[in-house]
């Protein structure tokens, strides 16, 4: 039993968080109470800690010992919120890590809780309601007193496995176990297992059954996609997967790996990649190598329904691991994400089309999913260090043909692209005797049965089993594991990894067998060698839990020493768990009980269970003609702008780091006003090239209700019209990922799925496209009992297409931002050819008007022709702006382009309206005069169709002088009849849409944009500090204050480092990182460009004495999440130096050396600020605390470089320019100085507004720092720290917006060149 030391911390909840809780309580009718909160820390150890250790703990945790813990009393109620009993929180893992690295011996674990005190009279029932408000039952417990916190450290006794008596009880015994264990085995699979175990003449263990269930779940084996289909009584010729494979067979060119690894690999290019060279003491060098592109997209729907934060976080983490475990190891680079949920029903903003049908108690509401889920996904990406650059958000919940269709089981999609050395793309064969290794985090009792649970309709499983199936994420340890993988593949042909897989559904029980089975091997494992963070787990829990951040891999025994040294340097846990055999048999040995929980042939586990046959019939949707003659067009426009699929997505974007890695060219935010309207994401392949990668998405689920195959073709079409904005070239260079969601088993849905796969396969083959990767989630149905009523919500068939392609020149990417140039016009290309079909449109959704025909990709040759023309115009720099038509139709395209460009529009749709009317009302158009036509309801309907149909198409802005040539290009492709000159830009802040002289819409663009951003604003208010959300909303229309600009006091094209570079002298710079830091590569690249000799220095190198700071002239402490920021950003990193006498002396000596320079950025800034006591001239320095918004802020912000002593900023003084910020704790705090800012403080960087005034206004000042402080320097200017990231934007191509005259380098290169000059 552990000794538990309680320590009292600081206030836990901010004033606005308290106010939100009180508002929620009031909404439940609870009586008024006074609420206070504080953090408490519980330190578990084998024996009582000595006084010196306790003193260090208090300093580390900012906490105090107490003689006795406080108790609740009459009228004062205690709610002690802790991690869920029986689990170990990610916070605890990281905090304990810090204590170990600070030399605090004897500590078993540190956990954190929050004591909430409520003063007031409450009944038992009211206390239960408050408990529900105060904790997340998925991840937390509420304890009645402090003594109960000892249960956090309770150790269970280990148990052995159990068996199911198949020999004695036959099939019935297995049927019973199937239900009790939540295995989701089919009747065929139960028969298969009974037959095989009877042949083996033994009973199956519970471990083997769970392992089989996971390995053979729909989630893992995709049985429906490999099934036979009988539709309307006829056997179909191909499986779903067969039709997907047809696309690759027809167009294999450009694809390196398809269908046989964790990700697909497509051809890239030979580029110079930048990373440390182990043979040169970890010196950063450029390496020219053939580099291919990884593409992967998958979903995490079931866990996100149950626990949105954890579900979305581990969804992102699992997809990242898939990329990293491709081939023999690779590097994830940039991500995408998306969410589809039912109606939000935002309090105070309930929309007229929203109805609340109810939901099962154990799943989260759509609003909670969208408040918590995106934060979970973003937090994982941020902490791991992968920019998220693309996404979508859709809501739908509607009664259609007698069924409620919607997304109570949400779609949470996570994907991305990565880079891989050509020589690492294929796994090698694992030889007999090879070691089988687990790399990454330890196992714990979470995520049991996730694969099987996600394969079931939501609501058909026991609620407790649903909770058991959700994992928890620890991105910081996944980052450490990725660093190990990076060090391995960076060894090139000396890479020790033979083969690698990520650990996902089914845990080790799925990953290890998959690893050896791929090589035709068997294996022997030692169960008790598996690293665990919880005591007392039984064999099933050890072998089958889905603890995240783990990989399995194989190496030769001779490479164990080098692999161990890499892991030790990165502080990444690993264990040799097994050995490969040549007998095809799987044995898991438990030495604790001297038995074998698993002992069976692999062909029983992964053999061919009976093939599934799916039988279904066509269920045709009811057809209702589309009518909209009585709808006010302006009102419709405002409704459409509020629909989440159309509305601004700021609340989903600014929470995600979009610049980490320094390879981002085009993120979601466009132009000098940073408007979230980009069509595609674009990254660069290296720091010395403009080659890159692009990715886009296409999804049209509401269309599937009307015509499922059409929805599939439209998804492909939308992905192509989105990615066409990038400089790709031949359409065959684009490769697609297809993610399929359906409610299989619901009558008619299997048939829709089959016909849609068939349609997409044929369309892709006609377009020269292939689908080398994808995933399915085919249990998209939620069922529950509501009193006497059985309810269900069935999702429409939902295909999400993600397109990936190599880019020839990222600088040619075109955005939707309208350019304020003279003599430009807007052209509209209508790929719907006047049909203007309205089925499934945003317009229909906001009026509950589920009628009309489905839009479709009727002619693939015309889409290809359109793409070819756009690509030629992109390559020739003929497009000023480009935006494809999608949700919200042409109206949404126009207003989004206007929002981005902050300019008015004068649009005349006369000819387009005529085409729409003639196409849909041919007889009327031939028999009536124009004025008679315009008096008809059909004409009003034509206006609605023209403005709001969502057929494929695009608007382009071009110079007037180029119009004739551009029309001729479309003529050559036989598309000229579908190109319309529709209008021009104006100086007025007004949108005018006309039919000749008749105004259809005439409205203020500020008002329209406020409506467009209202949904995002309201969710942001509920999630973050509402005062900050309101401040950002109030800036809409204040163009002068919110515009980005550059005012440099130097020549951006002059390289002041050039003379020093030409001299050949290269000062050595230590690029310093700690575990969890993720910004080292771009920091090293920036300094290398300025003539430094950069070296990768890990804190473990300094602690082990492999490296000494005295060998360097400069130190750069990098950004990221050292130890996951668990004790305050940068604090744990700093304490590991201050509490280590040798390191403290080494750093102090470096800081006092007059010949050195230091730069701390972001997490490095926070860390160095905590070392102020050993840095001369830092009196008055702030610490950095949580942002005022209490949210991670990723922005392109304006800063000013004031006059200061800073040597590295000396050459930039007086300049103002945009810079990337990405942090959660960047607010300069002067509490240690009584809240006073010293007149002598060396302020080196300040946030300013668009008028170059120091600002406190959020988000122009993204964190609330007083006096706009973004960076400070010490008295002699040798040590400068800042929260923004100049290293991520030293190249002009890295900036989301830049002045036109910035070509190769941005203004921020001057900082790095200035450092080189300062060292002489």
From Swiss-Prot:
One of its GO terms (biological process) is 'de novo' IMP biosynthetic process. Gene3D superfamilies: 3.40.50.880, Phosphoribosylformylglycinamidine synthase, linker domain, PurM-like C-terminal domain, PurM-like, N-terminal domain. Mg(2+) binds at residues 679, 718, 722, 884. Residues 1069-1320 form the Glutamine amidotransferase type-1 domain. It is found in: Cytoplasm. It comes from the Bacteria. SMART domains: GATase_5 (SM01211). The active site is at residues 1162, 1285, 1287. Its EC number is 6.3.5.3. GO terms for cellular component: cytoplasm. ATP binds at residues 311-322, 678, 886. PANTHER family: PHOSPHORIBOSYLFORMYLGLYCINAMIDINE SYNTHASE (PTHR10099:SF1). Phosphoribosylformylglycinamidine synthase involved in the purines biosynthetic pathway. Catalyzes the ATP-dependent conversion of formylglycinamide ribonucleotide (FGAR) and glutamine to yield formylglycinamidine ribonucleotide (FGAM) and glutamate. The keyword Cytoplasm applies. It comes from Neisseria meningitidis serogroup A / serotype 4A (strain DSM 15465 / Z2491). Pfam families: AIRS_C (PF02769), FGAR-AT_linker (PF18072), FGAR-AT_N (PF18076), FGAR-AT_PurM_N-like (PF22689), GATase_5 (PF13507). The keyword Cytoplasm applies. It catalyses: N(2)-formyl-N(1)-(5-phospho-beta-D-ribosyl)glycinamide + L-glutamine + ATP + H2O = 2-formamido-N(1)-(5-O-phospho-beta-D-ribosyl)acetamidine + L-glutamate + ADP + phosphate + H(+). It is an enzyme of class 6 (ligase). Monomer. Keywords: ATP-binding, Cytoplasm, Glutamine amidotransferase, Ligase, Magnesium, Metal-binding, Nucleotide-binding, Purine biosynthesis. GO terms for molecular function: ATP binding; metal ion binding; phosphoribosylformylglycinamidine synthase activity. InterPro entries: Class_I_gatase-like, FGAR-AT_N, FGAR-AT_PurM_N-like, PurL_large, PurL_linker, PurM-like_C_dom, PurM-like_C_sf, PurM-like_N_sf. Pathway: Purine metabolism; IMP biosynthesis via de novo pathway; 5-amino-1-(5-phospho-D-ribosyl)imidazole from N(2)-formyl-N(1)-(5-phospho-D-ribosyl)glycinamide: step 1/2. In the N-terminal section; belongs to the FGAMS family. This is Phosphoribosylformylglycinamidine synthase.
């Amino acid at each position: 039993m552990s000794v538990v030391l309680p320590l009292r911390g600081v206030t836990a909840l901010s004033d606005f968080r308290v106010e939100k809780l009180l508002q929620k309580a009031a909404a439940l009718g609870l009586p008024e109470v006074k609420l206070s909160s504080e953090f408490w820390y519980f330190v578990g150890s084998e024996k009582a800690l000595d006084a010196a250790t306790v003193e260090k703990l208090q300093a580390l945790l900012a906490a105090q010992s107490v003689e006795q813990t406080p108790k609740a009393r009459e009228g004062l109620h205690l709610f002690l919120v802790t991690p869920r009993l029986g689990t170990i929180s990610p916070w605890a893992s990281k905090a304990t890590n810090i204590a170990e690295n600070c030399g605090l011996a004897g500590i078993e674990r540190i956990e954190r809780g929050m004591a909430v005190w409520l003063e007031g009279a409450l009944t038992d029932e009211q206390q239960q309601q408050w408990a529900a408000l105060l904790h997340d039952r998925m991840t937390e417990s509420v304890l009645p007193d402090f003594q109960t916190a000892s249960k956090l450290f309770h150790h269970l006794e280990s148990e052995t496995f159990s068996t199911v008596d198949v020999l004695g009880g036959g099939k019935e015994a297995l049927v019973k176990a199937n239900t009790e264990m939540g295995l989701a085995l089919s009747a065929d699979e139960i028969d298969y297992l009974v037959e095989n175990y009877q042949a083996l003449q033994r009973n199956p263990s519970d471990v083997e059954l769970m392992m089989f269930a996971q390995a053979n779940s729909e989630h893992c084996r995709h049985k429906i996609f490999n099934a036979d289909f009988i539709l309307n009584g006829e056997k179909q010729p191909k499986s779903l997967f067969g039709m997907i494979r047809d696309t690759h067979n027809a167009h294999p060119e450009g694809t390196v790996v398809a269908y046989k690894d964790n990700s697909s690999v497509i051809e890239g290019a030979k580029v110079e990649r930048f990373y440390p060279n182990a043979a040169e003491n970890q010196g950063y060098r450029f390496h020219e190598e053939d580099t291919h592109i990884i593409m992967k997209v998958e979903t995490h729907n079931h866990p996100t329904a149950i626990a949105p934060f954890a579900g979305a976080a581990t969804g992102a983490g699992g997809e990242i691991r898939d990329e990293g475990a491709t081939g023999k190891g690779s590097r994830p680079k940039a991500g995408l994400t998306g969410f589809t949920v039912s109606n939000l029903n935002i309090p105070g903003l309930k929309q007229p089309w929203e109805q609340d049908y109810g939901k099962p108690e154990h799943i989260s509401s759509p609003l909670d999913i969208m408040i918590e889920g995106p934060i979970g996904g973003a937090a994982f990406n941020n902490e791991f260090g992968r920019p998220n650059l693309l996404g979508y958000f859709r809501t739908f919940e509607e009664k259609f043909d007698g069924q409620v269709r919607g997304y109570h089981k949400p779609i949470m999609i996570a994907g991305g692209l990565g880079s891989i050395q050509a020589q690492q793309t294929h796994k090698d064969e694992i030889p007999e005797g090879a070691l089988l290794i687990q790399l990454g985090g330890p196992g714990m009792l979470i995520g049991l049965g996730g694969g099987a649970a996600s394969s079931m309709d939501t609501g058909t499983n026991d609620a407790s089993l649903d909770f058991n199936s959700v994992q928890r994420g620890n991105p910081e340890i996944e980052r450490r594991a990725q660093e190990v993988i990076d060090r391995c593949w960076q060894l090139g042909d000396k890479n020790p990894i033979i083969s690698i897989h990520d650990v996902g559904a089914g845990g080790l029980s799925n990953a290890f067998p998959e690893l050896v089975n791929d090589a035709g091997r068997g294996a022997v494992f030692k169960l008790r060698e598996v690293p665990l963070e919880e005591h007392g787990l039984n064999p099933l829990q050890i072998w089958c839990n889905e603890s995240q951040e783990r990989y399995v891999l194989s190496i030769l025994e001779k490479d164990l020493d080098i692999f161990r040294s890499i892991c030790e340097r990165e502080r990444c846990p690993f264990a040799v768990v097994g050995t490969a055999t040549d007998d095809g048999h799987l044995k898991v040995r438990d030495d604790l009980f001297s038995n074998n929980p698993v002992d069976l042939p692999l062909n029983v586990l992964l053999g061919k269970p009976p093939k599934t046959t799916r039988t279904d019939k066509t269920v045709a949707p009811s057809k209702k003609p589309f009518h909209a003659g009585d709808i006010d067009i302006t009102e419709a426009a405002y409704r459409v702008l509020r629909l989440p699929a159309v509305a601004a997505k700021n609340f989903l974007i600014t929470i995600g780091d979009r610049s980490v890695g320094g390879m981002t060219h085009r993120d979601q935010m466009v132009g000098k006003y940073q408007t979230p309207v980009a069509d595609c994401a674009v990254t660069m392949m290296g720091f010395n090239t403009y080659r890159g990668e692009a990715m886009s998405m296409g999804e049209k689920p509401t269309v599937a209700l009307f015509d499922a195959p059409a929805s599939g073709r439209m998804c492909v079409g939308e992905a192509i019209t989105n990615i066409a904005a990038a400089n790709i070239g031949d359409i065959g260079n684009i490769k697609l990922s297809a993610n399929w969601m359906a409610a299989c088993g619901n009558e008619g849905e299997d048939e829709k799925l089959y016909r849609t796969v068939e349609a997409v396969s044929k369309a892709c083959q006609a377009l020269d496209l292939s689908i080398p990767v994808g995933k399915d989630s085919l249990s998209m149905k939620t069922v529950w009992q509501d009193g006497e009523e059985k309810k269900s919500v069935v999702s429409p068939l939902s295909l999400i297409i993600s397109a990936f392609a190599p880019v020839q020149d990222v600088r040619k990417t075109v955005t939707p931002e309208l350019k304020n140039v003279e003599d430009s016009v807007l052209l509209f290309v209508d790929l719907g050819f006047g049909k203007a079909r309205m089925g499934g449109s945003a317009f229909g959704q906001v009026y509950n008007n589920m009628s009309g025909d489905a839009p479709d990709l009727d002619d693939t040759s015309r889409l290809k022709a359109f793409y070819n023309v756009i690509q030629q115009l992109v390559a020739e720099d003929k497009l000023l702006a480009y935006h494809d038509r999608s949700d919200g139709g042409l109206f949404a395209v126009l207003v989004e382009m206007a929002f981005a460009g902050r300019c008015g529009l004068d649009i005349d749709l006369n000819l387009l309206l005529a085409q729409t009317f003639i196409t849909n009302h041919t007889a009327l158009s031939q028999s009536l005069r124009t004025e008679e036509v315009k008096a008809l309801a059909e004409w009003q309907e034509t206006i609605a169709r023209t403005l709001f149909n969502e057929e494929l198409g695009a608007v382009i802005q071009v110079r007037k002088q180029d119009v004739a040539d551009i029309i001729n290009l479309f003529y050559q492709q036989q598309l000229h009849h579908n190109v319309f000159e529709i209008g021009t830009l104006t100086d007025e802040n007004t949108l005018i849409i006309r039919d000749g002289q008749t105004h259809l819409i005439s409205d203020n663009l500020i008002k329209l944009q406020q409506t467009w951003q209202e949904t995002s604003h309201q969710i942001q208010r509920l999630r973050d500090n509402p005062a900050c959300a309101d401040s950002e909303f109030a800036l809409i229309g204040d163009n002068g204050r919110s515009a980005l600009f550059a005012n440099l006091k130097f020549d951006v094209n002059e390289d002041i480092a050039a003379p020093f570079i030409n001299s050949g002298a290269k000062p050595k710079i230590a690029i310093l990182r700690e575990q969890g830091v993720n910004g080292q590569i771009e920091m090293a690249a920036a300094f290398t460009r300025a003539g430094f000799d950069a070296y990768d220095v890990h804190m473990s190198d300094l602690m082990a004495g492999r490296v000494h700071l005295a060998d360097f002239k400069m130190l750069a402490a990098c950004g990221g999440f050292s130890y996951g920021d668990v004790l305050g950003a940068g604090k744990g990193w700093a304490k590991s130096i201050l509490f280590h006498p040798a390191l403290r002396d080494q750093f102090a000596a470096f800081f006092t050396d007059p010949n050195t320079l230091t730069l701390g950025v972001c997490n490095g800034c926070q860390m160095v600020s905590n070392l102020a006591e050993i840095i001369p001239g830092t009196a008055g320095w702030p610490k950095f605390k949580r942002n005022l918004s209490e949210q991670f802020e990723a922005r392109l912000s304006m800063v000013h470089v004031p006059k200061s002593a800073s040597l590295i900023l000396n050459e930039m003084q007086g300049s103002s320019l945009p810079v990337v910020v990405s942090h959660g704790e960047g607010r300069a705090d002067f509490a240690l100085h009584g809240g006073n800012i010293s007149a002598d403080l060396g302020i080196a960087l300040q946030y300013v507004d668009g008028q170059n005034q120091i600002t406190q206004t959020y988000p122009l000042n993204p964190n609330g720092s007083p006096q706009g402080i973004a960076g400070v320097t010490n008295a002699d200017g040798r040590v400068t720290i800042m929260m923004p990231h100049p290293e991520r934007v030293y190249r002009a191509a890295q900036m989301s917006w830049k002045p036109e005259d910035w070509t190769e380098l941005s203004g921020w290169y001057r900082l790095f060149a200035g450092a080189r000059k300062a060292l002489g």
